[in-house]
Amino acid sequence: LVYTLPAVSLVLSPFLHRQRSTPEPAASDQMRNKTIDRPKLVRLMALYFFITYAALTITFYAAFLVDGYHLPKTFSGVLISLFFLAIMAPGLILDRIIGIFKGYTNVAAIAMIGAGLFCFGIFRDRGMLVVGASLAGFGYGLMQPLIYDKTAIIAPPRAATLALSFVMAVNYLAIMLCPFLIDTFTRLTALHGDRVPFLLNGMLTAGLALLAFRRRDDFTLGLDASYYKR
């Protein structure tokens, strides 16, 4: 069901109103940059890599956890579907969410990911696992568009696509490396169990949430007032 949802967009596409594109204002953030701001780009890439790595713990390890809890095997598929459905949800009400959390939006999003992972690592109840998948997906889906938007800002219009390609590349890198990083950690620490990946990344994410709270005025971890002041 989740994977058929893009068909809704295709069906509605003929009803979109076409507007002629207007030049970027000379005073915009993009036009102030002559080249890509590499330090900011690297920090955005690192942040995107980590939240992707942490959130994808659910997709890689939920099946093992569900099996260990002796729940129906199909339930892991339900959890993963809910996770991806929750990733889509913030885009529908993004402005409202930013209006509520304002400068703490990234803090809240990272905290949601961490809380979702802890739900998997601590609770055995089906309801809490559903809550965990929804929280982690919602937090991840909230941060994605913000990272993409910040990436576009740090580059002039002619280089914005290149900057975005670098950021999106680390998404696939995180997908590829996630199981290897977690398995390496478990081998080095001799910690084993179906809950370990969730508790490990839950603690790492909690640490990042604390850092984001302390550095909420930072370009990467914070959110500029221009996002919520009209």
Where are the model-predicted features located?
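Helix-to-loop junctions at the C-terminal end of transmembrane segments
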Residues: P90-K102, T186-R187
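Extracytoplasmic gate region of multi-pass secondary transporters
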Residues: K40-S81, I87
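Symmetry-related core transmembrane helices of the 12-TM Major Facilitator Superfamily/SLC fold
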Residues: V2-F15, V196-F213
